Regions:
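Short, surface-exposed basic-aromatic patches at helix termini and helix-loop junctions that form
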Residues: 22-25, 75-76, 96-105
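Short acidic, hydrophobic short linear motifs in intrinsically disordered regions
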Residues: 209-227
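A structured, charge-rich N-terminal accessory region that forms the first stable segment of a protein
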Residues: 1-63
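Acidic beta-strand-to-loop metal/phosphate-binding motif
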Residues: 8-9, 78-89
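A conserved mid-domain beta-alpha-beta active-site/ligand-binding segment of alpha/beta enzyme cores
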Residues: 126-215
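Conserved beta-strand -> loop -> alpha-helix junction used to position metal-binding or nucleic-acid-contacting
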Residues: 30-37, 104-131
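Short amphipathic alpha-helical interaction segments
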Residues: 230-245
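C-terminal engagement modules used by replication, chromatin/transcription, nuclear envelope/ESCRT
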Residues: 246-291
Length: 291
């Protein structure tokens, strides 16, 4: 009987890398996690209603069906369910989640276990926090190593239980954002209380009081966003989360700082649109004059 192997990855980009690394055959499959795990709501259970709520919280309205398929897949038919991961929150949480969805056939490949790859990544990384993850590695670099032979590890019973317990903790913890700031498996939770504390630290500083009111909100938003984000691909999400918390904070809204910020944004958008129209008219005039 042929052994069936399933590779579980965090994104389509990682899927492309893994596809080139394995000797793909009809007995090997690759599945991509259909949701983001580093921000938003994690499913507390696997009912259709709960998974739809998870998709809605992430504004991924079309992924509730794929979430249901992912969580209700029969993982027991595979001899090995292999999770490819590094040390960022997204990939660590995927490993924990798979421990909840599997029994005794879970395996892992941690790219940080390869000392050469790990040290080179830390030396050359341009990320805000140099936390290694699979998608950050180029296929040419990955192809130099025998990942399935040298770095594949079976998750033992005790470790499996710990991973499953970790997933239980995180899916019941309310947090806007989950990030790793080092390669030590420690996941930091970002909630409203933490963002408000960061806001107060900035507002209590001397330089903040010297700023004109019309730039204060922009300064708060940019500093908090920078302190939250781990890598450039997450910057927009961090900005949205910080903006959501600040806009609902009475200290900010009662001072009119949000209104001032929005007025400036609207004016800049209006000016940008007018500039666009002006440039289009310029191009038309040039073509007319050339005739």
């Amino acid at each position: 009987m042929n052994k069936k192997i399933l590779h579980v990855v965090s994104s389509d980009a990682v899927k492309e890398r893994v596809f080139q690394l394995i000797n793909s055959s009809k007995n090997e499959e690759i599945v991509v996690c259909p949701t983001s795990l580093f921000y938003g709501k994690l499913p507390k259970n696997y009912t259709k209603k709960e998974l739809t709520a998870t998709a809605l919280s992430l504004q991924k309205y079309s992924c509730s069906d794929s979430l249901y398929e992912f969580t209700h897949r029969d993982y027991s038919v595979y001899n090995k369910v292999i999770v490819w991961h590094g040390r960022n929150a997204e990939e660590i949480l995927l490993l924990y989640w798979m421990a909840d969805l599997t029994k005794d056939n879970l395996y892992e490949i941690d790219v940080a276990d390869c000392k050469e790859v790990f040290e080179e990544f830390k030396r050359t990384s341009l990320y805000h926090f140099p936390v290694i993850f699979v998608e950050a590695l180029e296929i040419e670099e990955l192809e130099r190593y025998d990942w399935l032979g040298e770095y594949l590890k079976k998750v033992g019973e005790e470790q499996h239980s710990q991973y499953k317990s970790n997933w239980e903790y995180w899916r019941n913890k309310r947090s806007f954002l989950r990030v790793c700031r080092d390669n030590d498996w420690v996941i930091d939770s970002v909630d409203e209380e933490l963002i408000v504390k960061m806001m107060h630290d900035i507002m209590n500083s001397d330089y903040y009081h010297k700023l004109p009111d019309w730039v204060k909100y922009a300064v708060l938003l940019s500093i908090i966003t920078y302190d939250l984000y781990v890598d450039f691909s997450h910057l927009f999400v961090c900005n949205r989360i910080a903006d959501l918390v600040l806009r609902n904070n009475k200290e900010i809204t009662e001072n009119g700082l949000v209104d001032l910020f929005d007025i400036i944004q609207w004016r800049e958008a209006y000016q940008f649109e007018n500039f666009g129209r002006f440039r289009r008219l310029q191009q038309v005039n040039k073509r007319l004059l050339a005739k």
